UniProtKB/Swiss-Prot annotation:
Stored InterPro entries: Aldolase_TIM, Elp3/MiaA/NifB-like_rSAM, Lipoyl_synth, rSAM
Gene, per the UniProt record: lipA
Major site of localization recorded for this protein: cytoplasm
Protein name: Lipoyl synthase
Binding residues annotated for [4Fe-4S] cluster 2, in chain numbering: C93, C97, C100
Natural source organism: Actinobacillus succinogenes (strain ATCC 55618 / DSM 22257 / CCUG 43843 / 130Z)
Family: Belongs to the radical SAM superfamily. Lipoyl synthase family.
SUPFAM superfamilies membership: Radical SAM enzymes
Domain of life: Bacteria
GO cellular component: cytoplasm
HAMAP family cross-referenced by the UniProt entry: Lipoyl_synth
Length: 320
């Protein structure tokens, strides 16, 4: 009998180390992968000076970006434009979703100085719009909601003109407590991603629940009817287009007015494989359907991610 696997606190488990402890049957690192179509090619910038500057600034303040931790394909574009999505509460997630490249493990306690350091970094970068997200922190009584509120408060204290979007986890089992924590320091945009369709949740989002996520979006909107709510979906995990359209209908039924829809890309051979590549024309059709359903803003395209050009989307610009 083998020795039971024991995670060490503060250690990042990624790729094979992460997915080896997930009971997912269709991860085969030796399987033949789908060939990327021509529209999935990324053009890298000629200079990395701006990218290095942002990375060094974050390292200097001990901060993290989801752009790096989740291996976002748009990192070079966004960093070159001087924008980044900050990831609070550390870089180790208590969940182990097999599509995600963020490390899994036992996280360290939250840094009480992080809200202040974050606010100062944003001030140094002279940002007008910022997106704050986090790992899942199922180890915390409020699931990290109080830390979100502290960050919003500190950011606004130093940057009174800024617009703040928060991309939150599902606050599993603590929705009411989480919303109470956010009550006095709400964001300008509240974002929570459904990620994909309910039929695939057990496989792709272990520990999550489709109805919980809808409840979170619905109850935030009931508490703050004037604040836009937003959600994002990935395609290419085994769903079909009609199932995605049904999720979009569910979002509208629960008051969500902003949508992002992008192509899933496999971070490594130890993650869930891409089941299909959706064409740009299909993304255009999704955007048209979203408008018909009443979404005020819908960013739909192969490289669209939840915080991709979030400032442009919030102002009503076309993102694809």
């Amino acid at each position: 009998m083998g020795t039971p696997f024991k995670m060490e606190r503060g250690v990042k488990y990624r790729d094979a180390a992460k997915t080896s402890i997930i009971k997912v049957t269709n991860i085969d690192p030796d399987r033949e992968l789908l060939q990327k179509p021509s529209w999935m090619k990324i053009k890298l910038p000629a200079s990395s000076a701006k990218i290095d500057s942002i990375k060094n600034g974050m390292r200097r303040h001990g901060l993290h970006s989801v752009c790096e931790e989740a291996s976002c394909p748009n990192l070079h574009e966004c960093f070159n434009h001087g924008t980044a999505t900050f990831m609070i509460l550390g870089a180790i997630c208590t969940r182990r979703c097999p599509f995600c490249d963020v490390a899994h493990g036992k996280p360290l306690p939250p840094d009480p100085e992080e809200p202040r350091k974050l606010a100062e970094t944003i001030q140094d970068m002279k940002l007008k719009y910022v997106v704050i997200t986090s790992v899942d922190r199922d180890d915390l009584p409020d699931r990290g909601a109080g830390h979100f509120a502290d960050c919003v408060r500190e950011i606004r204290a130093l940057n009174p003109e800024i617009k703040i979007e928060i991309l939150v986890p599902d606050f599993r089992g603590r929705i009411e407590l989480a919303l109470e924590k956010l009550k006095n320091n709400p964001p300008d945009v509240f974002n929570h991603n459904l990620e994909n369709i309910p039929r695939l949740y057990r496989e792709i989002r272990p520990g999550a629940d489709y109805e919980w996520s809808l409840k979170l979006l619905r109850e935030f909107k009931a508490m703050f009817p004037h604040i836009p709510t937003k959600s994002g979906l990935m395609v290419g995990l085994g769903e079909n287009n009609e199932e995605i359209l049904q999720v979009m209908r569910d979002l509208r039924t629960n008051g969500v007015t902003m949508l992002t829809l992008g192509q899933y890309l496999q971070p490594s051979r130890y993650h869930l494989p891409v089941a299909r590549y959706v064409s740009p024309e299909e993304f255009d059709e999704f955007r048209e359907k979203a408008a018909e359903m009443g979404f005020e803003h819908a960013a739909c395209g192969p490289f669209v991610r939840s915080s991709y050009h979030a400032d442009l989307q919030a102002s009503g610009g076309l993102v694809k």
